[in-house]
A protein has these predicted regions:
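Hydrophobic residues on conserved beta-strands that form the core of alpha/beta folds
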Residues: 8, 16, 70-72, 133
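Surface-exposed amphipathic alpha-helical segments
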Residues: 19, 107-146
Length: 146
């Protein structure tokens, strides 16, 4: 199976009310931050970010992973345990879309979360940033459905 890394010009990222979207372009890479100041998390994409795998935790004593399987995508989270004395953690994720001809389209990213605050704000058992990741669309497929 062929794996392809999605670029920013191929996706549409919705912004939830009260969130901030910051795009930064420079000569080498492009960044996209979705900051949720009231929910205490930031979703972060970097155009040069590698596709993450379970090996992202090599050298860590404990880690966990979570997969959300949806009709049009699979979201794989790799969540290290919190460092003693810190309330924030960096989570890694891949969103995997099924492309044409059996290829897998990957969109990797990171989420900086204040664990205590985020866990208190789950809605129906769902972490607040999952809604953003569920609504990301591939532009090519958006054009075909319109």
């Amino acid at each position: 199976m062929v794996a392809k890394r999605l670029q920013f010009d191929e996706i549409e990222v919705p912004i939830v009310k009260g969130h901030e979207k910051v795009i930064d372009k420079d000569a080498t890479t492009e960044y996209l931050f979705i900051n949720a100041p009231r929910d205490i998390y930031t979703v972060y994409f970097d155009s040069s970010m590698p596709i993450f795998g379970k090996n992202v935790f090599d050298g860590c004593e404990e880690s966990s992973s979570l997969e959300l399987n949806m009709q049009d995508r699979k979201i794989c989270f790799y969540c290290p345990t919190r460092t003693k004395g810190r309330k924030d953690a960096l989570w890694y994720f891949n969103i995997v879309f099924a492309g044409e001809n059996g290829e897998s389209l990957f969109l990797p990213g990171q989420i900086l979360v204040n664990s205590d605050e985020v866990y208190r704000k789950t809605v129906g058992g769902k972490l607040p940033f999952v809604e953003i990741l569920e609504k990301i669309k591939i532009k090519k497929y958006m054009d075909e459905t319109v």
